Amino acid sequence: MISLIAALAVDRVIGMENAMPWNLPADLAWFKRNTLNKPVIMGRHTWESIGRPLPGRKNIILSSQPGTDDRVTWVKSVDEAIAACGDVPEIMVIGGGRVYEQFLPKAQKLYLTHIDAEVEGDTHFPDYEPDDWESVFSEFHDADAQNSHSYCFEILERR
């Protein structure tokens, strides 16, 4: 099963200049909980913004210009990325925008964090048809001392 995991502000903004323009430790914990011990696929820009392999996960970098870091697996196509994951129950696609666009048609599940923030962004989550998805989990949280904005975790499964 292919799943996408993303944090989205208003207007589906997911990033600005290779960074997330908010401070939500709870979302980072949600991300870790849902990706640990699963292969993660990301684009080169996302890889560069993280700066290191995510521990406890097979890191697969999709790029037309593969790098030389041998701590991760470099691939040039969506099919190659899927094959590099091996026989696993769930593959997690973690961004960025172009990689989400490439995998959305193949995805069966979306793990979304909806952030109540209007922020400037240069990267967006692809538009998706809500009628194609069923919400199977939703959990709202107010902003607090650690988390700069209110947010809602949601899991959607393709109908």
Curated annotation (Swiss-Prot):
Pfam families: DHFR_1
Effect of M16N: Increases catalytic rate about 2-fold. Increases catalytic rate about 7-fold
Signal peptide bounds: none
InterPro entries: DHFR (IPR012259), DHFR-like_dom_sf (IPR024072), DHFR_CS (IPR017925), DHFR_dom (IPR001796)
Domain DHFR: 1-158
Effect of M20L: Increases catalytic rate 2.5-fold. Increases catalytic rate about 7-fold
Catalytic activity as recorded in UniProt: (6S)-5,6,7,8-tetrahydrofolate + NADP(+) = 7,8-dihydrofolate + NADPH + H(+)
Cellular component terms (Gene Ontology): cytosol
CDD domains assigned to the protein according to its UniProt record, in alphabetical order: DHFR
Pathway assignment: Cofactor biosynthesis; tetrahydrofolate biosynthesis; 5,6,7,8-tetrahydrofolate from 7,8-dihydrofolate: step 1/1
GO molecular function, one term: NADP+ binding
Effect annotated for changing M92F: No effect. Increases catalytic rate about 7-fold
Binding-site residues for substrate, renumbered to this chain: I5, D27, R52, R57, T113
E.C. designation(s): 1.5.1.3
Residues that coordinate or bind NADP(+): 7, 13-19, 45-46, 63-64, 76, 95-102
Mutation effect (M42Y): Increases catalytic rate almost 2-fold. Increases catalytic rate about 7-fold
Intrachain disulfide bonds: none
GO biological process, any: folic acid biosynthetic process
Effect on the protein of changing M16 to F/S: Increases catalytic rate about 2-fold
Keywords: Antibiotic resistance, Methotrexate resistance, NADP, One-carbon metabolism, Oxidoreductase, Trimethoprim resistance
Effect of C152S: Increases catalytic rate 1.5-fold. Increases catalytic rate about 7-fold
Additional free-text comment from the UniProt record: The strain K12 sequence is shown.
Family according to the record: Belongs to the dihydrofolate reductase family.
Role of this protein: Key enzyme in folate metabolism. Catalyzes an essential reaction for de novo glycine and purine synthesis, and for DNA precursor synthesis.
NCBIfam families: PRK10769.1
Designated name of the protein: Dihydrofolate reductase
Species annotation: Escherichia coli (strain K12)
Encoding gene per record: folA
